């Protein structure tokens, strides 16, 4: 769990809920991706009819992963963007949970913090597991499959760098901008906005893989999990996807293991030289950071599935002219691209202010508007947040 940040003890956590979609369900409910057996330990004919893509091969893994099949659907990144290749290996197991759904228990144990009337919001949900720092297309794929199986949630961890003593790096997505990004995923998630559920890493750092899954089942009372094939969890990342499936079966949860979304441009500009030894060509946050460091915004957009948005908070020492704004780099709330000149950008302040070009140097960010009438007096004010989307 050290590097994979994959454990969940819901002792101290914050719940971040985007604005509900008009088509979002009023309460969590189970929408099966495939047919599942009933909540009985009976083997035999208890299995439902499984909707498997014609011609898709079966995936056989050693015990205890006894029943897996492929549901072929995916997106490959690169020049041939229309091709699909990612697969979903699915295992489902239900047992008698013996779990009370009494909200008083949740409140008493302080499992969900500041959820208001939605104290039972995560109950019976399908939780996608990961770091979700970049919210890239691989993360979106996990949310998409979670929505096929039920009400989608993202379970991520905060404070990892501080706990492990890593050097500070600005986030790829500004914290205040995550809600917008998740809302943009609704068309991929059956018009449901995934809800992000964050846990303090310091509270779960030493959980074993078994304790992690037990917390998901006993404390959060979820219905199932979705994870990538390279997912690691538990203390010192000691658990892998196969063990996750085994433990989910034991605790009566469904487990959906999704193949990585591959980056067909993985050798582009030497990107593979910048990522860690576990990289096998999959879309990753490390690739996004490297592409930003190269200043290749087209490649960044492909990895993210959207334009990269740099968010800034206007400070009192900003300089505004008729067509020009100058801000210190200390205004930035997330990772910028490399120093340089960027054409065809968009400036936003809740609405669209206009097209601009952006010049980033070692100390400042200069925004030059295409239209001299875009920046009227008092358009930009102190403590206001601005967004720059790079074309």
Curated annotation (Swiss-Prot):
Transmembrane segments: none
Disulfide linkage: none
Reaction equations catalysed: FMN + ATP + H(+) = FAD + diphosphate
Main location, first listed in the record: plastid
Transit peptide start-stop: 1-53
EC assignment: 2.7.7.2
Cellular component annotations (GO), alphabetically ordered: chloroplast
Keywords: ATP-binding, Chloroplast, FAD, Flavoprotein, FMN, Nucleotide-binding, Nucleotidyltransferase, Plastid, Transferase, Transit peptide
GO MF term (any one): ATP binding
Subcellular location: Plastid, Chloroplast
Top-level enzyme category: transferase
Flavoprotein is among the record's keywords: yes
Pathway it works in: Cofactor biosynthesis; FAD biosynthesis; FAD from FMN: step 1/1
Pfam families in the cross-refs: FAD_syn (PF06574)
Cofactor(s) in the UniProt record: Mg(2+)
Region feature (Disordered): 1-31
Alphabetical list of Gene3D superfamilies matching this protein: HUPs (3.40.50.620)
Name by which UniProt lists this protein: FAD synthetase, chloroplastic
Species in which this protein is naturally found: Oryza sativa subsp. japonica
Source species taxonomy: Eukaryota, Viridiplantae, Streptophyta, Embryophyta, Tracheophyta
């Amino acid at each position: 769990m050290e590097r994979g940040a994959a454990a969940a003890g819901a002792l101290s956590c914050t719940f971040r809920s985007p604005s509900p979609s008009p088509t979002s369900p009023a309460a969590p409910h189970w929408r099966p991706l495939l047919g599942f057996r009933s909540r009985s330990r009976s083997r035999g004919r208890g299995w439902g009819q499984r909707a498997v893509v014609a011609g898709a091969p079966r995936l056989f893994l050693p015990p205890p992963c006894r029943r897996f099949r492929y549901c072929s659907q995916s997106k490959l990144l690169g020049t041939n963007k229309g091709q699909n290749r990612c697969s979903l290996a699915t295992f489902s197991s239900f047992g008698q949970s013996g779990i009370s759904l009494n909200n008083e228990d949740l409140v008493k144990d302080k499992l969900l913090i500041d959820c208001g009337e939605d104290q039972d919001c995560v109950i019976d949900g399908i939780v996608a597991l990961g770091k979700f720092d970049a919210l890239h297309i691989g993360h979106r794929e996990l949310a998409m499959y979670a929505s096929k199986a039920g009400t989608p949630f993202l379970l991520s961890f905060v404070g990892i760098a501080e706990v492990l003593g890593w050097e500070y790096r600005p986030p790829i997505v500004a914290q205040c901008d995550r809600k917008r990004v998740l809302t943009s995923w609704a068309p991929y998630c059956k018009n449901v906005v995934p809800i992000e559920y964050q846990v303090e890493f310091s509270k779960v750092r030493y959980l074993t893989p078994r304790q992690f899954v037990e917390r998901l089942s006993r404390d959060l009372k979820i219905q199932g999990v979705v994870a990538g094939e390279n997912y690691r969890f538990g203390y010192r990342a000691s658990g892998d996807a196969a063990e996750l499936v085994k433990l989910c079966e034991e605790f009566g949860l469904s487990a959906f293991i999704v193949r990585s979304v591959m980056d067909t441009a993985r050798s582009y500009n030497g990107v593979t030289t910048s990522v860690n030894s576990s990289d096998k060509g999959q879309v990753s946050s490390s690739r996004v950071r490297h592409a930003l460091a190269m200043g290749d915004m087209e490649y960044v957009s492909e990895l993210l599935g959207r334009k990269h948005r740099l968010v800034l908070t206007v400070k009192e020492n900003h300089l505004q002219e008729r067509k020009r704004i100058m801000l210190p780099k200390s205004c930035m709330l997330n990772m910028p691209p490399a120093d340089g000149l960027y054409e065809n950008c968009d400036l936003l302040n809740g609405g669209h202010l206009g097209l601009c070009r952006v010049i980033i140097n070692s100390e400042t960010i200069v925004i030059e508007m295409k239209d001299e009438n875009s920046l009227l007096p008092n358009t930009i004010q102190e403590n206001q947040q601005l967004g720059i989307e790079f074309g």
